[in-house]
């Protein structure tokens, strides 16, 4: 479905999800987007669940993520690969954070993940702050 075009003549992505790039065509879910964005900002853990095909991914990618990005959060999409040859889930999360934040700003003390450190250590030992181009602090937001 990667060749599907969403534009004014074709404003619906079919079975694909809306994305940040196609958010201009995503309408009618403003109440849900507002409520979920408030929950994400208030709670350390927010779980969005429901039956397949209800539009959870579209709400996240075309509704909540663009709004939270404007409000100083950096979305980090994480898909854990459980194949035997894959890095540990903790390592995959650390790498996803480094990839996502590389395009969203800069760390005050750039670094990389240290071999063998836990995810908690990675997130807390750095004494580091992610800044946007305007010098505002940006908070990574993990989305699984």
Question: What are these language model-derived features?
Answer:
Residues 1-144:
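Amphipathic helix/helix-loop-helix segment enriched in hydrophobic residues with interspersed Lys/Arg
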């Amino acid at each position: 479905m990667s060749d599907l075009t969403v534009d004014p003549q074709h404003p619906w992505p079919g079975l694909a999800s809306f994305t940040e790039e196609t958010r201009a065509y995503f309408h009618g879910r403003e109440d849900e987007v507002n409520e979920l964005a408030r929950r994400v900002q208030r709670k350390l853990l927010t779980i969005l669940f429901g039956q397949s095909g209800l539009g959870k991914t579209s709400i996240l990618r075309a509704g909540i993520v663009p709004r939270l990005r404007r409000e100083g959060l950096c979305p980090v999409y994480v898909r854990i690969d459980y194949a035997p040859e894959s890095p540990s889930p903790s390592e995959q999360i650390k790498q996803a954070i480094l990839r996502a934040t590389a395009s969203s700003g800069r760390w005050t003390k750039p670094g990389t993940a240290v071999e063998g450190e836990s995810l908690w250590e990675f997130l807390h030992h750095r004494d580091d702050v992610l800044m946007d181009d305007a010098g505002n602090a940006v908070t990574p937001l993990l989305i699984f």
